[in-house]
């Protein structure tokens, strides 16, 4: 490996975070959500790391589930978007996947499958987010009409719009609306994602779906959430070149950064083709030789430039942390006007994922 741009995946952090979040709800079962290639961390590796603590996994689409099966992951897999086409019902049965059904068309597809070749299903209720799910007013009738498709593994699920915001009352209204129909139907429920598990005790039901928190992402607007989680990814690269420029000289495309004094500029081998956000502003932090340096100029496809004037002995080959244990990913996301979820999932496939234990 010539280029030193890598995403280090911290296996111990993944295990710690999952166990810490699951411990908040000891009466519930918890599953790790590994959709979007485990939020950019590598779904197969993450599933292998967590398979002894997470009895099920969740993905978004059937292709993600099959990739786990092809890698030898045998635990049940919940497909959160259900079937996109009728043929996926058969695929789910063949691969021991649980489909989360959110509309009657999907139930009709399932009904058309041979009776002995139907996968287990969950049912999703729209409690107010208005993306996917049966309407609150329809779900009881749907469970009666399609009772023959349900099994001992069927769960009623919903999803929150604002669970990370402890001051937003909409989550309480979603919980109340969902609880009314769930109590009437009488099936086990799955409500909590990572933020809800931390912030909303009433949402901790039969199954909690632990996603971004497992990877060290932000789970709450509160300052003290009562659980300590650690970043599971360190994105790092190395310095390709160091040069000194005079006051008044510009750096990068568009000359967006201009030196106010003689400055030392380091070029780093990572860019937006690797998933480092192009919209990062000047002064976005990185870590070099134990000190913070700052973005100077626009992010290029394959490189960034940083101001290291204040750091001694910077040289070619020095490691640069873009985010991770010393530079919080949330801070970088704020500099790019986005969220940590997006940064994690956009790390491109040309960046190797290197799994490490402490």
Curated annotation (Swiss-Prot):
Q: Which reaction does it catalyse?
A: L-alanine = D-alanine
Which cellular components does GO assign to this protein?
cytosol
Q: Which domain of life is it from?
A: Bacteria
Q: Keywords on this record?
A: Isomerase, Pyridoxal phosphate
Which pathway does UniProt place it in?
A: Amino-acid biosynthesis; D-alanine biosynthesis; D-alanine from L-alanine: step 1/1
**What sort of enzyme, by top EC class, is this?**
isomerase
What's the Enzyme Commission number for this chain?
5.1.1.1
Kindly name one Pfam family recorded for this protein: Ala_racemase_C
Its Gene Ontology molecular function terms? alanine racemase activity; pyridoxal phosphate binding
Instruction: Name any cofactors this protein relies on.
Output: pyridoxal 5'-phosphate
Q: InterPro entries, per this entry?
A: Ala_racemase, Ala_racemase/Decarboxylase_C, Ala_racemase_C, Ala_racemase_N, Ala_racemase_pyridoxalP-BS, PLP-binding_barrel
The catalytic site is made up of 35, 253
Tell me the residue numbers annotated for binding substrate. Answer: 131, 301
N6-(pyridoxal phosphate)lysine is carried by which residues?
A: 35
Q: A GO biological process this protein is involved in?
A: D-alanine biosynthetic process
Q: Tell me its family.
A: Belongs to the alanine racemase family.
Q: Tell me, what does this protein do in biology?
A: Catalyzes the interconversion of L-alanine and D-alanine. May also act on other amino acids.
The name this protein carries in UniProt is Alanine racemase
Species the sequence originates in = Alteromonas mediterranea (strain DSM 17117 / CIP 110805 / LMG 28347 / Deep ecotype)
Q: Taxonomic lineage per UniProt?
A: Bacteria, Pseudomonadati, Pseudomonadota, Gammaproteobacteria, Alteromonadales
Instruction: Write the gene name.
Output: alr
